[in-house]
């Protein structure tokens, strides 16, 4: 059993990465299908979810929302039933393996709800009889980059999380999150399509003419577009990008394009409102009162106010003064939303804009010196599976990882309460100096994370944080 590769899972609110260690990328990236539950926001941080769809209709540019059902949390029995089917699909349909022969490495969100973790452990041990479960927090994403200091910006489906890591230690007091992600882009795209569906955005592919028949347009909208999140995601991925002004401080005009949704019809994607303007929802302006407020504690009262840039700056405000510049030099992007074209440059421009916007703002008073120091950690891997790769590397040195549970210890626990105590809490996973030691040991023996690409593209010009380049294999 020890000779078999471990299974590495990263369960996200929208997609799940699954594969084997010590491979450099997941075998499959599949939708997190926990039907009949729809709990993407719940998986992000324990937020309530609505198990019923909200039907949105459009009538002469008037959008109304019907069927408002109070939100509720899932029960443990519901989670176990959905997780059993979900893991069965992973083991039998994708990874093609026996669950009782493979150790499971779970790369988890640091604030994954405990009820979900308990249900997941119960299903894997009691029904699938896996021999070992190891919990790895997202700070393992530093290991493929050979760094010990980074400002983690994880922008996923339903929220963006910012966590600073300084010399291997997570600064949890500075952790911030905001409900902005690819779901925000999808909702914005839906609103645009609903309000403009009869304004000639549906194109007939045969004669390349706009269709104004409201019955045909609404039928296409409800049957083919709004009910397909994959199609909306594909529109955003293929057509949209993060825009910025040119050197003359003028907006760049973007051409409209046609997106083919079927053999007969296409959608006219507006260049200004959608292609370059859709991403603006991630950087929506905050109230001036928030910018003029010099009380740092007010940032904790309402995390929903602001945008991605202000969330990052609020995180830096919570860090010590000598930590801010090293963190700014080592920004590490995670999540699929950060893979949009132009995301890095737009993020830096928005950070600079917030620092220059108001002379009396707390950002300008305390963080103005960071202008010109926002740099990203360069690496040859994709942002959406970097955390998974960190778990894949750590799977080769499980004897050094303490956040693990064996099947024997779980089944021998005298009560359900004792079993739940075996599951590690997030506050016990904050110090990742252990991960650094594992990386040093691992890179000199079994796996080099750079063996899949050249080392020249890995390190940023700033080396204000420790790197582990001396531990690379020399041969």
From Swiss-Prot:
Name the predominant localization: cytoplasm
Q: Identify its protein family.
A: Belongs to the actin family.
Tell me the keywords, alphabetical order: Cytoplasm, Cytoskeleton
- Kindly name one Pfam family recorded for this protein: Actin
Q: What is the lineage of its organism?
A: Eukaryota, Amoebozoa, Evosea, Eumycetozoa, Dictyostelia
Entry protein name: Actin-related protein 10
Q: In the UniProt record, does the keyword Cytoplasm occur?
A: yes
Q: Which GO terms describe its cellular component?
A: cytoplasm; dynactin complex
Which terms does the UniProt entry file under GO BP?
A: microtubule-based movement
Q: Which species is this UniProt entry from?
A: Dictyostelium discoideum (Social amoeba)
Tell me yes or no: is Cytoplasm among this UniProt entry's keywords.
yes
**Subcellular location, record wording:** Cytoplasm, Cytoskeleton
């Amino acid at each position: 059993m020890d000779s078999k590769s471990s299974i590495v899972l990263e369960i996200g609110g929208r997609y799940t990465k699954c594969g084997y260690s010590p491979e450099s990328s997941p075998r499959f990236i599949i939708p997190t299908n926990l039907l009949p539950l729809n709990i993407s926001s719940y998986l992000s941080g324990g937020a309530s979810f609505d198990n019923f769809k909200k039907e949105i209709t459009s009538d002469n540019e008037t959008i109304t929302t019907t069927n408002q059902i109070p939100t509720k949390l899932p029960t443990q029995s519901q989670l176990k039933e959905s997780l059993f089917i979900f893991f069965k699909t992973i083991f039998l349909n994708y990874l093609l393996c026996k669950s009782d022969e493979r150790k499971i490495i779970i790369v988890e969100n640091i604030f994954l709800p405990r009820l979900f973790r308990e249900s997941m452990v119960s299903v894997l041990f009691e029904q699938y009889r896996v021999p070992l479960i190891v919990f790895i927090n997202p700070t393992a994403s530093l290991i493929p980059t050979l760094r010990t200091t980074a400002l983690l910006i994880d922008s996923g489906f339903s929220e963006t999380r910012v966590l600073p890591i300084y010399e291997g230690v997570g600064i949890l007091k500075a952790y911030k999150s905001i409900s902005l992600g690819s779901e925000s882009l999808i909702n914005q795209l839906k609103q645009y399509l609903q309000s403009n569906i009869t304004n000639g955005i549906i194109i007939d592919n045969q004669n390349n003419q706009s269709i104004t028949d409201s019955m045909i347009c609404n039928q296409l909208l409800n049957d083919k577009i709004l009910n397909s999140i994959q199609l909306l995601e594909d529109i955003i991925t293929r057509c949209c990008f993060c825009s910025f002004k040119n050197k003359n401080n003028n907006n760049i005009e973007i051409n409209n394009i046609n997106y083919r949704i079927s053999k007969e019809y296409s959608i006219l994607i507006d260049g200004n409102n959608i292609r370059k303007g859709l991403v603006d929802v991630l950087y929506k302006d905050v109230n001036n009162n928030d910018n003029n407020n010099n009380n740092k504690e007010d940032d904790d009262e309402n995390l929903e106010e602001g945008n991605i840039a202000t969330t990052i700056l609020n995180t830096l405000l919570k860090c010590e003064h000598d930590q801010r510049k090293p963190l700014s030099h080592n920004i590490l992007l995670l999540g699929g939303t950060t893979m949009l074209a132009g995301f890095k440059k737009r993020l830096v421009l928005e950070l600079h804009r917030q620092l220059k916007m108001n002379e009396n703002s707390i950002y300008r008073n305390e963080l103005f010196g960071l202008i010109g120091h926002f740099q990203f950690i360069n690496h040859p891997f994709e942002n959406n599976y970097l955390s998974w790769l960190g778990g894949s590397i750590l799977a080769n040195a499980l004897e050094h990882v303490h956040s693990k549970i064996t099947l024997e210890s779980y089944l021998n626990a005298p009560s359900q309460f004792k079993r739940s105590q075996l599951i590690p809490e997030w506050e016990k996973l904050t110090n990742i100096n252990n991960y650094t030691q594992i990386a040093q040991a691992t890179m000199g023996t079994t796996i080099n994370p750079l063996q899949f690409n050249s080392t020249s593209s890995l390190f940023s010009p700033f080396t204000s944080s420790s790197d582990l380049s001396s531990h690379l294999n020399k041969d």
